Every structure is written in C-alpha cells, then in structure tokens.
C-alpha cells in the first residue's frame, strides 16, 4: 500500500474540491424553450423589470410620508445675557437673563397636504406605468428574438438539405465524366454551388447567433434553444383599435398629466397660509422666577399676483401641454397600428404567393431540368442554377413566413393584451 505524504493528500483534496466547486458553479441551461416559456422566463428574470419594480416600491414607500406633518423643532437658547455694563458676564444679576428650551410645530394648510398626497399617488402611477412599458418591451424583444432564432435554425436546416442533395448530382457528374459525355470543367460546378451555399449558411449562422444572444439577454439562459411551434396569434384590427387608450404608453402619459395636475394643486395651495405654533420655557435665577412663552406664526401670502399666481399659471400650462402630448401619442399609436396592419396584410399576401406559386413552380422546374440533364438534353450549369433557384425559393418562403410571424408578435404585444 502506497502512503502519500500529508501535504500531498491535502493538495489532492483541495484539487478535488475545486473541481467539484467549478462543476457546481456552471450555470444550468433552461434547456429548449417554447415561445410561451421564453416570454414567461424573460418576464421573471429581466433585470430591467426588477429595476422598474424596485422604483415602484420606492414610490409607494415615499408616498406614506407625503401628507404627514413635518417634524417638530427643538429650540435651545440663552437670552438676554449681559456682555457689558455692571452685570456683564453674570447669569444671575439681570432678571432678563434666562436659559430657554422650546418646541415648535409647523402645520401646512390642508390643501397643501392633500396636494402632496395626490402628487405622491401620481408618482406611483408614473412608476407603475414605467413598469408596464418596460414589461411590454421585454416581452416584445424576447418574442422577436425567439421567432428570429426559430426561423433562422429552420433556414439553416433547409440549406443543409440542399447541400446534402448535391451528393446525388456529384455522382451523376462523375458518371458522365467517366463516360465522356461531360467536360472536365463541369466537375467543378457542384463545388461552386456548395461554396455559394456555404456563404448563405455563414450569413444565416450569424443571424442565428445574434438572435440567440438577444434571447439570452432577456431570459438569462446562456444558451437558449427554440423548440415547439411558432405562436399562432390572431390579429384582430377591430379589437386592437378599440384598446388603444389602454396601452401602457398612454397610461404613462396619463400618469404624467396627473403629476402636472397635482403640481397645479400644490401651487394653488401656496395661496393659503401655513401655521406654526411654538412653546418656550425660560429658566432664570430662582430669585426672579421662570417664564413661559407661547406663540403662533401665520404665513401671509399677500402678494399672490407676483408670487403664487405665476407659478399656478406655469403649472396649468404644463398640465395642458401634457394633455396635448397625450393626443399626439394617441394619434401616433393609431397611425403606427394602421401601418403595421398594412405591412402584415402585405406579408401575408407574399407568403401565400410563395407557398402556392413560387415554390411549387421552382420545384417543378428543378425536377424537369434534373431529368433533362440526366437525359443529356441540358448542360450541368443550367441544372445547377435551377437547383439553386429552388433552394432560394424555399428559403425565401421561410423568410416570408418569419415576416408574418414577426408582424403578428409585434402587433399583438404592442397593441394587444398585457400578457401573451
């Protein structure tokens, strides 16, 4: 039996422990994700959504103190201490000298306190609207990334099938070269087509990698995979137009208008006086006796025309501007929806044309040219071009299908319900 030194044993154990720790530290992939799973995972894990939720929680916490009274004030002092004359420096010779302690409390007028509460509630509304807007953005970007990844991988598989189909063509060329019915230069044409397919594949691989990176950003999965079927989303123009006013962008603007209106109320509340009450106790030499004082201070907004009224007018103008901005945002959303619906209808028509006409024609032509080449009636270059044309038609059909899916996702998430 071999005995290892204690130091060597410790090094071995440390090495094993480090290996196990590194194994546990590897992030676990969520595995293949369906469309719905990806959107739900992003809604749960996106840091930007957590940041918006924290901002909303902060606004709610801040609102608790919005309409409360300010903290009381403790006043400490020494009054009427002689610094010259026969009593200079003495605390007891002058009956006016005293040490004082007092408390004061400010009472803002009720209109101001209510306006502050309304302002805090409006701040909560802005935070909540921001959370809704960010949630919709996260869901939209996640959904589009999943669609791009799904169709990008399908297009890659289509190109792989085309590349594999060239093997049969290569065998035909080899046989014709052996029989002397083909020129030696024609043996290079399948390789040229493979090179063209490789270029297309490299471009599509970059698209897939970019989509996977975008999906990883929102889901937190370091290597997301798209699985399942693409979403089947119903685009209902009537329902979408009817729900325009409930969209997060308009709700956010409504919250900003509420803030401006609360500022108007605050400006108007400044025309009402605030109160301050104070109590002071004065400690003097026992031979004179102690003293107490009670006082009330009242603000006098006597010059409203030069102070409060201009601020009120400015706040009202900002609120009115917010209402105009809301109408501008609404019109922009309506125009964007109409434009997106028009694009969707166009992409649907193009997809239908590709499926029903372009791809079947390209396939039939490729079959005819392949048979003609096999019969010696067509040169290899023409046969390869029609084969490449079929591949391009099939990839283009996938492109058009992806356009339709992207349209449906963008329209339903941007203008539709809050949840997919």
Question: Where are the model-predicted features located?
Answer:
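Amphipathic alpha-helical coiled-coil segments
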Residues: 49-66, 127, 134, 138-159, ...
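Bacterial Sec-pathway N-terminal export signals of envelope proteins
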Residues: 28-78, 83, 106-107, 115, ...
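Short, charged, amphipathic alpha-helical segments
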Residues: 117-121, 184-192, 313, 380-388
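N-terminal signal peptide c-region/cleavage motif recognized by signal peptidases
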Residues: 22-27
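Periplasmic alpha-helical coiled-coil/stalk elements that build and connect Gram-negative outer-membrane
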Residues: 2-5, 33, 134-246, 340-347, ...
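Hydrophobic/aromatic residues within transmembrane alpha-helices of membrane transport systems
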Residues: 42, 103, 149, 215, ...
């Amino acid at each position: 039996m071999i005995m290892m030194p204690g130091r060597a044993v410790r090094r071995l154990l440390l090495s094993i422990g480090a290996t196990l720790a590194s194994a546990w530290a590897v992030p676990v992939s969520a595995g293949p994700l369906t469309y719905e799973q990806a959107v739900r995972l992003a809604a749960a894990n996106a840091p930007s959504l957590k940041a918006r939720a924290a901002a909303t929680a902060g606004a709610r916490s801040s609102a608790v103190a919005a309409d409360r009274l300010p903290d009381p004030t403790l006043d400490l002092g020494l009054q009427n201490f002689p610094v010259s004359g026969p009593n200079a420096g003495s605390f007891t010779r002058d009956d006016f000298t005293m040490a004082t302690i007092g408390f004061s409390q400010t009472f803002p007028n009720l209109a101001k306190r209510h306006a502050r509460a309304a302002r805090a509630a409006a701040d909560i509304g802005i935070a909540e609207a921001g959370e809704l807007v960010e949630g919709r953005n996260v869901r939209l970007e996640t959904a589009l990334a999943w669609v791009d990844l799904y169709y990008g991988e399908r297009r890659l598989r289509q190109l792989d099938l085309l590349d594999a189909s060239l093997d049969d063509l290569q065998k035909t060329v080899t046989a014709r070269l052996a029989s002397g019915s083909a020129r030696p230069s024609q043996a290079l044409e399948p390789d040229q087509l493979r090179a063209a397919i490789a270029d297309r594949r490299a471009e599509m691989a970059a698209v897939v990698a970019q989509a996977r990176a975008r999906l990883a950003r929102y889901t937190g999965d370091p290597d997301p995979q798209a699985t399942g079927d693409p979403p089947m989303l119903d685009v209902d123009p009537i329902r979408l137009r009817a729900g325009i006013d409930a969209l997060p962008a308009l709700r956010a603007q409504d919250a900003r208008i509420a803030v401006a209106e609360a500022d108007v109320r605050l400006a108007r509340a400044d025309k009402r006086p605030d109160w301050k009450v104070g109590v002071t106790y004065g400690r003097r030499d026992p031979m004179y006796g102690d003293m107490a004082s009670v006082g009330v201070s009242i603000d006098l907004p006597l010059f409203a025309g030069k102070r409060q009224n201009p601020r009120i007018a400015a706040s009202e103008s900002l609120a009115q501007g917010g209402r105009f901005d809301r109408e501008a945002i609404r019109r922009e959303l309506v125009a964007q929806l109409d434009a997106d619906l028009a694009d969707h209808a166009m992409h649907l028509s193009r997809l239908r044309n590709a499926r029903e006409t372009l791809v079947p024609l390209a396939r039939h032509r490729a079959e005819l040219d392949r048979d003609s080449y096999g019969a010696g009636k067509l040169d290899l270059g023409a046969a390869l071009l029609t084969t490449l044309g079929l591949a391009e038609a099939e990839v283009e059909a996938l492109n058009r299908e992806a356009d339709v899916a992207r349209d449906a996702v963008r329209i339903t998430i941007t203008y539709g319900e809050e949840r997919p």
